[in-house]
From Swiss-Prot:
Pathway: Cell wall biogenesis; peptidoglycan biosynthesis. Residues 12-182 form the FAD-binding PCMH-type domain. Belongs to the MurB family. Its cofactor is FAD. It catalyses: UDP-N-acetyl-alpha-D-muramate + NADP(+) = UDP-N-acetyl-3-O-(1-carboxyvinyl)-alpha-D-glucosamine + NADPH + H(+). One of its GO terms (molecular function) is UDP-N-acetylmuramate dehydrogenase activity. This is UDP-N-acetylenolpyruvoylglucosamine reductase. Its EC number is 1.3.1.98. GO terms for biological process: cell division; cell wall organization; peptidoglycan biosynthetic process; regulation of cell shape. Cell wall formation. Keywords: Cell cycle, Cell division, Cell shape, Cell wall biogenesis/degradation, Cytoplasm, FAD, Flavoprotein, NADP, Oxidoreductase, Peptidoglycan synthesis. GO terms for cellular component: cytosol. PROSITE patterns: FAD_PCMH.
Length: 341
């Protein structure tokens, strides 16, 4: 067995039978085929920033280290072809240095470019789907490489086709980004709204987003974590109206389909759970949406804490939180909501 602790940001004491860095597509095909022949579970992992290992993984972990960025342009757009192993935050920083704008709101989101479409990562009013041109996929069953358009990816809130029809036996080897040269800053959320739209530049937004995230979110090098543990729940307008009568100050964000998104961190905070500790796992003091490895936490500590939070929020608000983090059991991914029921 090999130590998985350095390869996931929760930094839990788990192992895998074997861990292999993948640097080219032929190697990826060969390693996948070998796992199939030997009937071994296989897990494709980027930087492990959005996973919770429930137990030792009884198979092979393939680390996506496919690197490289290609930049082309026309009169109206910049086009970036980014291989899946590239670090997302470093890509955002690089793009601004190159005078390519539009990714700045997504600064400091952990993980690889190849993981970004799976969750449809988003922050401060921008989601991956807003900048995605295509996603390049390898079908490991047939060794065919194909591209899915933005529409074909079926992006939703922290959701995509890569969590469903293309969840198993497919790997994102590259993403295509399309960024307008007619840059318009997105300043909807938080302290970004205080910036002057007519004078602000992308570097200032990048710096502000980094400052906000660093002030609210723990550094995984200090306290292991996987960022936002729960999704922000989206509820019906009727249910929201009932809640607002009881909690007039409840933060909320109307959605295009008429439903209303709530702030999961606020719900957890209202239950008095900031700083709450169970075993070695705890709710972060600054951001209740983040669960941390406070001190030598085990996987079961994190699961029990998540269960406790979910129950408390449901008892108070009649809203059931869903994990945003992917749960990995000994032979592969499992339903995260079921795991904490």
């Amino acid at each position: 067995m090999q130590n998985l602790q350095p390869f996931h940001t929760f930094s839990l004491p788990v192992q895998a039978q074997k861990i292999i860095e993948i640097t080219d597509i032929e190697q990826l095909k060969q390693q996948w085929a070998a796992c199939q022949t030997n009937k071994l579970p296989v897990l494709l992992l980027g930087q492990g920033s959005n996973v919770l290992f429930l137990r030792d993984f009884q198979g092979v972990v393939l680390l996506n280290r496919l690197m490289g960025i290609q930049h082309t342009q026309d009169a109206d757009f910049h086009y970036l072809h980014v291989n899946g192993g590239e670090n997302w935050h470093q890509l955002v920083a690089w793009s601004i240095q190159q005078g390519i704008f539009g990714l700045e709101n997504l600064a400091l989101i952990p993980g690889c470019a190849g993981s970004a479409p799976i969750q449809n990562i988003g922050a401060y009013g921008v989601e991956f789907k807003d900048v995605c041109d295509y996603v390049e996929v390898l079908n490991l069953h047939t060794n065919e490489i194909f591209r899915l358009s933005n529409e074909q990816c079926q992006f939703g809130y922290r959701d995509s086709i890569f969590k469903h029809a293309y969840a198993t036996g497919y790997v994102i080897i590259a993403v295509g980004l399309k960024l307008s040269k007619n840059w318009i800053p997105v300043l909807k959320y938080g302290s970004l709204a205080n910036l002057e739209k007519s004078a602000v530049n992308a570097q200032q937004i990048f710096d502000e987003v980094c400052a906000i995230r660093r002030s609210k979110l723990p550094d995984p090098a200090e306290f292991g974590n996987a960022g936002s543990f729960f999704k922000n729940p989206v509820i019906s307008k009727v249910d929201f109206d009932h809640l607002q009568q009881e909690y007039p100050d409840i933060p909320h964000f109307p959605q295009a389909d008429g439903r209303v998104k709530l702030a999961a961190g606020w719900l957890i905070d209202q239950c008095g759970l900031k700083g709450y500790q169970l075993g070695g796992a705890a709710v972060h003091q600054q951001q209740a949406l983040v669960l941390i490895n406070q001190q030598d936490a085990t996987s079961s500590d994190v699961v029990e804490l998540a269960h406790h939070i979910r129950q408390k929020v449901a008892q108070r608000f009649a809203v059931w939180l869903q994990p945003e983090v992917r749960f990995i059991d000994e032979d592969g991914e499992v339903d995260s909501e079921q795991a904490i029921c």
